[in-house]
Amino acid sequence: ADPDHLDIYGTPEAYRESFEHFTSLIRPDGCLLMKQSINVTPRLQEGVKFYTYTGAFDAKELSTFNFQLSTGSPDFYAENVRIGGGEIFFDFVGPDVRIPDIQLGVPVKVNIENGVAAIALAWLNGVTPEEIKHGMATFAGPRRRFDFHLKKENIVLIDDYAHHPAELKASILSVKELYA
């Protein structure tokens, strides 16, 4: 995980330790959904279900996302990613589920990964594929995070409060891909 808010945690090690401690607080009937490439060891109580996710899971998309996957496949991932014309679509894949043609309401490439996590949690909690597709397509995101103010044929104006180097890079790359 990319340490953030080191003003609070002090060091990257303290940041990771906080996350590991947090995982120990999950109730035995709960679950943890964790990005597969995060280099921490969760301290789960017995009875906690553990799932992993990633954004896209094929060689072409993985090189684009620059994920460092651990061995084994993630439980939840995106497949058949289509980016262009200011839109992003993908197929959601998980244990015993495939939901085709998910459209992102906030078409930022990093939101493929965020979307997979949100969809996985929704799916694990009984939300139907139809509700998931509608929710993902209509979700406008938080204010000032890839917020479209103007969308015309030759002009696009986006307000994005990205403040972490990884967030800035992801936003810039997303704009380039959406409108290349």
Which functions belong to the PLM regions below?
Residues 1-157, 177:
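Acidic, Mg2+-coordinating active-site environments of NTP-dependent enzymes
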Residues 4, 164-165:
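Catalytic P-loop NTPase motifs of RecA-like helicase/translocase cores
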Residues 141-144, 165-180:
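Active-site beta-alpha connecting loops in nucleotide-dependent enzymes
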